[in-house]
């Protein structure tokens, strides 16, 4: 890991702040989520939502999406320049669900974007509070990560669907800033770069002229973000090659796919943060909790504590299992879609099932679904223990990259082995390691061959009782070492479609 001296913590990225001490960070993150909470309360008033309607996660998501849309400057500009019939570029909206005569009914609301921006700024001391908006984007991204597989997107860019554990944050909008870049997986960055290179190959003018210069700067910035996620010198050296290429093309795409595969064993450092739906912060603010005064962290006990005593509802379709819906949202709240199920189960205190065994579809309800048959139920988002979120990828204490089963990107800093199917992964590396990156490729393959599935990652790190807020007594869980726990493995989850 590069010396922490050069890195900002992700709370600092989250709040756009420069170096601050721990208390300042806790206060500014607290200010951010408090602002989200105040905004949510105000929106519930504006929309005349009852308490129960305000606790409905579908309503929370609609309100979050509306404010994100109101602040999406590029899209707003585009909509105003390309007016489409029957759509007002100055308005945004979505489904709001209300309880009428013992049934849930859907009502489509339209809201003025300018008005939404005013309410948001008012809740955030008159500021734009971009950090809060990014926070909502990351929550939506984590929800997508837990709900959908990206097999199609992977195949389209020439990657292998088994690399799905590298795809964290693949649905984050480009405008999500440093905090967004921190939570993107290696596969997500590789995919963005491949798309860019392909455009350059197909469009002669992509790298040319004034626009091309900006494109080039963006390309190199993305390369540096990806380089920063790798933890071995050889992987980083290969990224330098990709970044410095005069005219990126197929050779670079090959190198990037090679690097993505290598990240299945030599894992990248990807940040994880617990981002909760706006209604959860709203409930806490409404009950008189002062986030800024108390301080808040996205990677410590605070989100667990908040979820211990917030009651959130969800609409449930006729053949869905409410417990499974709860698991989906729990995983999204803790950014645990790519965590080992053994670890998640231990922390949650109930067995966490792989995606393919869940009887639940996504959280959002399509506009053509029948509301007559919709029920609602309380989401069970509590946990038995809490653990610190990691940004490391879990490399072993031998200071060389550790083994990782084909689809795990650790979320929690908890001791475990990362079992993996070496044969499966290494099979992807047949072929000729030649060309200008051959020595680096050889070195990377050697490191991968030397990693052992039984090596222990996060040595000595454990989970904590919910009463242990200072993290003084780590409980190091023991797992069945042979049994790996990948969430998407051998699975039939729906695809994510924009």
UniProtKB/Swiss-Prot annotation:
HAMAP family (UniProt xref): INFV_NCAP
Span(s) of short sequence motif Bipartite nuclear localization signal: 198-216
A cellular-component GO term for this protein: host cell
Lineage of source species: Viruses, Riboviria, Orthornavirae, Negarnaviricota, Polyploviricotina
Any single biological process term in GO: symbiont entry into host cell
Region (Disordered): 1-23
Keyword set includes RNA-binding: yes
One GO MF term attached to the UniProt entry: RNA binding
Known role: Encapsidates the negative strand viral RNA, protecting it from nucleases. The encapsidated genomic RNA is termed the ribonucleoprotein (RNP) and serves as template for transcription and replication. The RNP needs to be localized in the host nucleus to start an infectious cycle, but is too large to diffuse through the nuclear pore complex. NP comprises at least 2 nuclear localization signals that are responsible for the active RNP import into the nucleus through cellular importin alpha/beta pathway.
Pfam families documented for this protein: Flu_NP
Motif Unconventional nuclear localization signal: where in chain: 1-18
Listed InterPro entries: Flu_NP
Annotated coiled-coil segments of the chain: none
Organism of provenance: Influenza A virus (strain A/Gull/Minnesota/945/1980 H13N6)
Alphabetically ordered keywords of this record: Capsid protein, Helical capsid protein, Host nucleus, Host-virus interaction, Ribonucleoprotein, RNA-binding, Viral nucleoprotein, Viral penetration into host nucleus, Virion, Virus entry into host cell
Stated name of the protein: Nucleoprotein
PTM comment text: Late in virus-infected cells, may be cleaved from a 56-kDa protein to a 53-kDa protein by a cellular caspase. This cleavage might be a marker for the onset of apoptosis in infected cells or have a specific function in virus host interaction.
Quaternary state and interactors: Homomultimerizes to form the nucleocapsid. May bind host exportin-1/XPO1. Binds to viral genomic RNA. Protein-RNA contacts are mediated by a combination of electrostatic interactions between positively charged residues and the phosphate backbone and planar interactions between aromatic side chains and bases.
Family indicated by similarity: Belongs to the influenza viruses nucleoprotein family.
Compartment annotation: Virion; Host nucleus
């Amino acid at each position: 890991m590069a010396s922490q001296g050069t890195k900002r913590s992700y709370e600092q990225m989250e709040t756009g702040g420069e170096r601050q001490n721990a208390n300042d960070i806790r206060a500014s993150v607290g200010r951010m989520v408090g602002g989200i909470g105040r905004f949510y309360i105000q929106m519930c008033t504006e929309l005349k939502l009852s308490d129960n309607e305000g606790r409905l996660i579908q309503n929370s998501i609609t309100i979050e999406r509306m404010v994100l849309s109101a602040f999406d400057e590029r899209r707003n500009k585009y909509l105003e320049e390309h007016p489409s019939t029957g759509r007002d570029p100055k308005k945004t909206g979505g489904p709001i669900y209300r309880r009428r005569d013992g049934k849930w009914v859907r009502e489509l609301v339209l809201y003025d974007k300018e008005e939404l921006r005013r309410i948001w700024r008012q809740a955030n001391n008159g500021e734009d509070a971009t950090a809060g908006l990014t926070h909502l984007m990351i929550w939506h991204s984590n929800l997508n990560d837990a709900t959908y597989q990206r097999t199609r997107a992977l195949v389209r860019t020439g990657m292998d669907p088994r690399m799905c554990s590298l795809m964290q944050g693949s649905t984050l909008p480009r405008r999500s800033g440093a905090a967004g870049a921190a939570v993107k997986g290696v596969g997500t960055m590789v995919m963005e770069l491949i798309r860019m290179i392909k455009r350059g190959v197909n469009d002669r003018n992509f790298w040319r002229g004034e626009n091309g210069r900006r494109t080039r700067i963006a390309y190199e910035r993305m390369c540096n973000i990806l380089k920063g996620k790798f933890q071995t010198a050889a992987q980083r050296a290969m990224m330098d090659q990709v970044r410095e290429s005069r005219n990126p093309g197929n050779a670079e795409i090959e190198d990037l796919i090679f690097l993505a595969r290598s990240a299945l064993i030599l894992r990248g450092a990807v940040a994880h943060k617990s981002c909760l739906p706006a209604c959860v912060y709203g409930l806490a603010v409404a009950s008189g909790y002062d986030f800024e005064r108390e301080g808040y962290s996205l990677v410590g006990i605070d989100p667990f504590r908040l979820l211990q005593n917030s009651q959130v509802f969800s609409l449930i379709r006729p053949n869905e299992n409410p417990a499974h819906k709860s698991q989906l949202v729990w995983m999204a709240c803790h950014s645990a879609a790519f965590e080992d199920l053994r670890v998640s189960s231990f922390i949650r205190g109930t067995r966490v099932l792989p995606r393919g065994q869940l009887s639940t579809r996504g959280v959002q309800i399509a506009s053509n679904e029948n509301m007559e048959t919709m029920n609602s139920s309380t989401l069970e988002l509590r946990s038995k223990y809490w653990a610190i979120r990691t940004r490391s990828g879990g490399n072993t204490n031998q200071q060389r990259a550790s083994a990782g089963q084909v689809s795990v990107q650790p979320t929690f800093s908890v001791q475990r082995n990362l079992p993996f199917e070496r044969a499966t992964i290494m099979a992807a590396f047949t072929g000729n390691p030649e060309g200008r990156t051959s020595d680096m490729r050889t070195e990377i393959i050697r490191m991968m061959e030397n990693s052992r599935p039984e090596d222990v990652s996060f040595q000595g790190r454990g989970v904590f009782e919910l009463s242990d807020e200072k993290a003084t007594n780590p409980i190091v869980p023991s797992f069945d070492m042979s049994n790996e726990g990948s969430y998407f493995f051998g699975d039939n989850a729906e695809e994510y479609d924009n």
